[in-house]
């Protein structure tokens, strides 16, 4: 199965030992595998860990949740942008969405498979 690597924010990491301890947990939260690589991107404030993700997640379990999607102005826009927004979370767009603050923020429903 095809995979790719991304850097995921991990908060400040103070040592390689700490990164090796928390990296696998962060990766698991994103359905991925920690590669062992990490770097500090803002001194004393933010580090990132490298995670390998599968292009398509498989499994028998599903979990649906709402995620922020920025302002969406119509169903047509939501249906067009929803799949890409969901993909950025490693999930699939269910087609459901709603506005939570008029003119400011909408949410889309996504489905994780694992």
From Swiss-Prot:
Note: Binds 2 carbohydrate molecules per monomer. The 2 symmetrically related-binding sites exhibit similar affinities relative to one other.
Binding site for a carbohydrate 1: 12-16, 20, 36-44
Protein residues bound to a carbohydrate 2: 71-75, 79, 95-103
Domain notes: Each monomer contains 2 structurally homologous domains with high sequence similarity connected by a short five-amino acid residue linker. Intriguingly, a water-filled channel is observed between the 2 monomers.
Thermoactivity: Half the hemagglutinating activity is maintained by heating at 50 degrees Celsius for 3 hours. Is inactive by heating at 60 degrees Celsius for 10 minutes.
InterPro entries (alphabetical): MVL, OligoMan_bind_ChitinaseAct_sf
Source organism phylogeny: Bacteria, Bacillati, Cyanobacteriota, Cyanophyceae, Oscillatoriophycideae
GO terms of molecular function: carbohydrate binding; hydrolase activity, acting on glycosyl bonds
Domain of life where this protein originates: Bacteria
pH-activity relationship: Displays hemagglutinating activity from pH 5 to 8, but is inactive beyond these pHs.
Sequence repeats: 2-55, 61-114
Pfam families named in the record: MVL (PF12151)
Function: Carbohydrate-binding protein that binds oligomannosides such as Man(6)GlcNAc(2) with sub-micromolar affinities. The specificity of MVL is unique in that its minimal target comprises the Man-alpha-(1->6)-Man-beta-(1->4)-GlcNAc-beta-(1->4)-GlcNAc tetrasaccharide core (Man(2)A) found in N-linked oligomannosides. Displays hemagglutininating activity on rabbit, horse and hen erythrocytes. This activity is inhibited by yeast mannan. Does not bind mono- and disaccharides.
Region annotation Linker: where it falls in the sequence: 56-60
Top enzyme category: hydrolase
Induction record: Induced under low nutrient or anoxic conditions.
Keyword terms of this UniProt record: Antiviral protein, Cytoplasm, Glycosidase, Hemagglutinin, Hydrolase, Lectin, Repeat
Subunit structure, as described in the record: Homodimer.
Organism name: Microcystis viridis
EC numbers: 3.2.1.-
Subcellular location: Cytoplasm
Any single GO BP term: regulation of defense response to virus
GO cellular component assignments: cytoplasm
Protein name, per record: Lectin MVL
């Amino acid at each position: 199965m095809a995979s790719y690597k991304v850097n995921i924010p991990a908060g400040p990491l103070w040592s390689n030992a700490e990164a090796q301890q928390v990296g696998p947990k962060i990766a698991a939260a994103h359905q991925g595998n920690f590669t062992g690589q990490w770097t500090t991107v803002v001194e004393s404030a933010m580090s990132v860990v490298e995670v390998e993700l599968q292009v398509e997640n498989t499994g028998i379990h599903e979990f649906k949740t709402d995620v922020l999607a920025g302002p969406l102005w119509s169903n047509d826009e939501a249906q067009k942008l929803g799949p890409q927004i969901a993909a950025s979370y490693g999930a699939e767009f269910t087609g459901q969405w709603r506005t939570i603050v008029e003119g400011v923020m909408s949410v889309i429903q996504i489905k994780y498979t694992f």
